């Protein structure tokens, strides 16, 4: 049965996404209109707000956000196009308890995803920042999944869904970027910041040591 989204719900989502995207744009994480972010509005049926395609994320306009269903189709009439990777967001919402998803392209996450691609994951341990990912274990060791950057976006979404590690709120796409999520916008932002801190540290250590075996 269709669920009616109220204007207040939609405006809240727009405000949240615009606030996050401008903050992360100012950190250089949305270059050349790349990346996307979304905010879940309803579980069953799944409805979420997502940034529209091809927009400069350093500015705020009335055409920045579109509302879609689990099949990445707009739930209301619009001339806007949802992000090309909307189906990946849908997979994350359907397979996790995420309430917000952030996808960014940076030099650090591209470097790390390419270097560790053949392993299928990025190994991370012995770092205090792991706690920022809600992983509170002594001697914590995590594996951030990496998948191929498939041109076919349906296949990309399918592989992303199959590769999600429920214990790790992030997924890398080789030479593309990272998806990070959280139960709300605060968690999602914290998680993507933690991943980027970790990847920057790893990249610097790899260059310094001359090998990827840094832990």
From Swiss-Prot:
Disulfide bonds: none annotated. It comes from Persephonella marina (strain DSM 14350 / EX-H1). Its cofactor is Zn(2+). One of its GO terms (cellular component) is cytoplasm. It comes from the Bacteria. Zn(2+) binds at residues 103, 105. NCBIfam families: PRK06754.1, salvage_mtnB. GO terms for biological process: L-methionine salvage from methylthioadenosine. Keywords: Amino-acid biosynthesis, Lyase, Metal-binding, Methionine biosynthesis, Zinc. HAMAP family: Salvage_MtnB. InterPro entries: Aldolase_II/adducin_N, Aldolase_II/adducin_N_sf, MethylthioRu-1-P_deHdtase_MtnB. Catalyzes the dehydration of methylthioribulose-1-phosphate (MTRu-1-P) into 2,3-diketo-5-methylthiopentyl-1-phosphate (DK-MTP-1-P). SMART domains: Aldolase_II. This is Methylthioribulose-1-phosphate dehydratase. Pfam families: Aldolase_II. The gene is mtnB. Pathway: Amino-acid biosynthesis; L-methionine biosynthesis via salvage pathway; L-methionine from S-methyl-5-thio-alpha-D-ribose 1-phosphate: step 2/6. Its EC number is 4.2.1.109. Binds 1 zinc ion per subunit.
């Amino acid at each position: 049965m269709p669920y009616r989204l109220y204007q207040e719900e939609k405006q809240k989502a727009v405000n949240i996404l615009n606030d996050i995207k401008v903050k992360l744009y100012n950190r250089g994480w949305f270059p050349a209109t790349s990346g996307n972010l979304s905010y879940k509005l309803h579980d069953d049926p799944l409805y979420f707000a997502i940034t529209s395609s091809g927009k400069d994320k350093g500015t705020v306009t009335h055409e920045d956000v579109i509302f879609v269903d689990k099949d990445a189709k707009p739930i209301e009439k619009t001339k806007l196009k949802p992000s090309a990777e909307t189906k990946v967001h849908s997979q994350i919402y359907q397979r996790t308890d995420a309430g917000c998803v952030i996808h960014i392209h940076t030099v650090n996450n591209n470097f790390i995803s390419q270097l560790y691609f053949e392993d299928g994951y990025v190994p991370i341990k012995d770092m205090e920042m792991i706690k920022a990912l809600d992983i509170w274990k002594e001697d914590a060791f995590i594996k951030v999944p990496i998948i191929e950057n498939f041109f076919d976006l349906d296949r990309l979404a399918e592989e992303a869904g199959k590769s999600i590690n429920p214990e790790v709120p992030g997924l890398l796409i080789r030479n593309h970027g990272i998806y990070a999520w959280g139960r709300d916008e605060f968690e999602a932002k914290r998680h993507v910041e933690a991943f980027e801190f970790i990847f920057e540290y790893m990249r610097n250590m790899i260059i310094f040591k001359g090998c990827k075996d840094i832990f």
